[in-house]
Amino acid sequence: MADFHEFYPLRRHNTFGFDVRARYASHIRSEADLLAALNDPRAVGLPLVVLGGGSNVVLTGDLDALVLLMEIPGFRVGTAPDAWLVTAGAGENWHGLVCRTIAEGLPGLENLALIPGTVGAAPIQNIGAYGVELRERFASVRALDRQTMRFVDLDLEQCAFSYRDSLFKQAGRDRYIITAVTLRLSRDWQPVLAYGELAREVEGNAAPDAAAIRDAVIAIRSRKLPDPAQIGNAGSFFKNPLVSAEQRDVLLASHPDLVSYAQPDGSFKLAAGWLIDRCGFKGLNDGPVGVYGKQALVLVHHGGGTGAALLALAGRIADTVQARFGVRIEPEPVVL
């Protein structure tokens, strides 16, 4: 029999700190644990929810489900002619992995430092920050295919990554459970400093190494984002919307200080934080939930609130942005 806990509290398993419970929860520390949990008779007929760090989820109420608490460890380094292949268990802490690879002389993940959550969640969201996305460092994932109950390896193309999206949020959402991730870190490392704020942070360092860039990213994120241990949050709550060059030019004509970033395909990514700030939401408190005073992209939970209240605020923000700018901003977290 698997290790099941009934009516298990999830407040410490979601970074918003919403006080909800799971019908059953099971700690998954190996692939054998995963198979045992899925084959347990108590799991029959129950929906399945996989939680890592709970840093990209909004829990709106108690879950009448089996919650798998992903805690599979592991770290190993392989080689390819032009790269190191780093494989980590899905339960490893993401920032811990970034720091470990740098400490072992394997640069490439430094721009993704201090992103909360676990390794297994990183491909689901195609995490990204300061000019780097996970897909640019990705080799493969190992996952359980629930249709066949066999473990499979999925490569870059199969994972269908796009901006904050992947196979695992679309057609494969209920099919695959990630147990390990393999990253490809080039031996020909070059710093990525195209993001203006990061470049300014390392000014004065003529040749910043990966550790210096990681430290700069940590400094920037620490200034802008609240610590979930102090204030409940999931980091950036909204995606930066993509618009055509024509739509961006129309907006720029009436808003000369609009913040936007050109994309390789000719479209533009608008800074959602700027849009929200211009609508007057930055620093707003709406009872136990609100908008962080230092970064309008971040929604916060001060305690005693609900996921439903947070989503109501998010909807209000999105509606206001659309009414003013004609652009719809979408949430990043998964809603359960």
UniProtKB/Swiss-Prot annotation:
The active site is at R164, S236 (proton donor), E332. Its cofactor is FAD. It is found in: Cytoplasm. It comes from the Bacteria. GO terms for cellular component: cytosol. It catalyses: UDP-N-acetyl-alpha-D-muramate + NADP(+) = UDP-N-acetyl-3-O-(1-carboxyvinyl)-alpha-D-glucosamine + NADPH + H(+). One of its GO terms (molecular function) is UDP-N-acetylmuramate dehydrogenase activity. Its main location: cytoplasm. Residues 17-188 form the FAD-binding PCMH-type domain. GO terms for biological process: cell division; cell wall organization; peptidoglycan biosynthetic process; regulation of cell shape. Its EC number is 1.3.1.98. It is an enzyme of class 1 (oxidoreductase). Pathway: Cell wall biogenesis; peptidoglycan biosynthesis. Keywords: Cell cycle, Cell division, Cell shape, Cell wall biogenesis/degradation, Cytoplasm, FAD, Flavoprotein, NADP, Oxidoreductase, Peptidoglycan synthesis. NCBIfam families: murB, PRK00046.1, PRK13903.1. Belongs to the MurB family. Cell wall formation. PANTHER family: UDP-N-ACETYLENOLPYRUVOYLGLUCOSAMINE REDUCTASE. This is UDP-N-acetylenolpyruvoylglucosamine reductase. It comes from Cupriavidus pinatubonensis (strain JMP 134 / LMG 1197) (Cupriavidus necator (strain JMP 134)). The gene is murB.
